[in-house]
Swiss-Prot record:
<dbReference type="GO" id="GO:0005737">
    <property type="term" value="C:cytoplasm"/>
</dbReference>
<dbReference type="GO" id="GO:0000049">
    <property type="term" value="F:tRNA binding"/>
</dbReference>
<comment type="subunit">
    <text>Monomer.</text>
</comment>
<keyword id="KW-0820">tRNA-binding</keyword>
<feature type="binding site">
    <location>
        <position position="15"/>
    </location>
    <ligand>
        <name>tRNA</name>
    </ligand>
</feature>
<dbReference type="Pfam" id="PF01195">
    <property type="entry name" value="Pept_tRNA_hydro"/>
</dbReference>
<dbReference type="InterPro" id="IPR018171">
    <property type="entry name" value="Pept_tRNA_hydro_CS"/>
</dbReference>
<dbReference type="InterPro" id="IPR001328">
    <property type="entry name" value="Pept_tRNA_hydro"/>
</dbReference>
<protein>
    <recommendedName>
        <fullName>Peptidyl-tRNA hydrolase</fullName>
        <ecNumber>3.1.1.29</ecNumber>
    </recommendedName>
</protein>
<feature type="binding site">
    <location>
        <position position="67"/>
    </location>
    <ligand>
        <name>tRNA</name>
    </ligand>
</feature>
<keyword id="KW-0378">Hydrolase</keyword>
<dbReference type="GO" id="GO:0072344">
    <property type="term" value="P:rescue of stalled ribosome"/>
</dbReference>
<dbReference type="GO" id="GO:0004045">
    <property type="term" value="F:peptidyl-tRNA hydrolase activity"/>
</dbReference>
<comment type="similarity">
    <text>Belongs to the PTH family.</text>
</comment>
<keyword id="KW-0963">Cytoplasm</keyword>
<feature type="binding site">
    <location>
        <position position="113"/>
    </location>
    <ligand>
        <name>tRNA</name>
    </ligand>
</feature>
<keyword id="KW-0694">RNA-binding</keyword>
């Protein structure tokens, strides 16, 4: 495997369309875009793979629940001997309005427990991530991130996921700097 793309979320139907599952929704979109299925049970998660631009890519949805995402991801990284800079993690971010997408090469967990778990298990912050804005909570944070998107927000989220997927294509074709220029170039509204 050349790349691992992991989307963060919580398993189970009741969480499918919740804000905290933006990463899972992105992986589902990527699977469809690259004509694969994320249905093989491996690495404490669901996986699928595809080839694009002469790169082999593993899609991963950890089934460990958010706060233990690192347990699943580190297994895949170690099995395929993928360097952290070839691990792309997609997740929700309450720091951005709904539909904003941002990419960076490395950084702290920003208060996100799933990312915190990955950093702890990998022993490094040096992995790229794509953050999908889910809005700033006006209420209890746990209740907010586990709530479903409002109808008026759904189009913004799916456009953000489309933009993230296009960024992944650009990354595989032309590298991370081009992908970051595309993703960070403007705000999706």
């Amino acid at each position: 495997m050349d790349y691992i793309i992991a989307g963060l979320g919580n398993p189970g139907e009741r969480y499918t369309f919740t804000r905290h599952n933006a990463g899972f929704l992105a992986i589902d979109y990527l699977a469809q875009a690259f004509n694969t299925k994320v249905d093989k049970i491996k690495f404490k998660g669901l996986t699928g793979s595809f080839e694009y631009a002469d790169k082999k890519v593993l899609l991963l949805k950890p089934m460990t629940y958010m706060n233990s995402s690192g347990d699943s991801i580190v297994e895949a990284v170690n099995f395929y001997k993928v360097k952290p800079e070839k691990l792309i993690v997609i997740y929700d971010d309450i720091a951005f309005d709904v539909g904003v997408v941002k990419m960076r090469k490395k950084g702290s967990d920003g208060g996100h427990n799933g990312v915190k778990s990955i950093i702890q298990r990998l022993g490094t912050e040096e992995f790229p991530r794509i953050r999908i804005g889910i809005g700033v909570p006006k209420e209890d944070m746990v209740k907010y991130v586990l709530s479903e998107f409002e109808d008026y927000e759904k189009q913004k989220i799916f456009r953000a996921i489309e933009k993230a997927a296009q960024g992944i294509k650009i990354l595989l074709e032309s590298g991370i700097d081009r992908a970051m220029n595309y993703i960070n170039g403007d705000v999706v509204v």
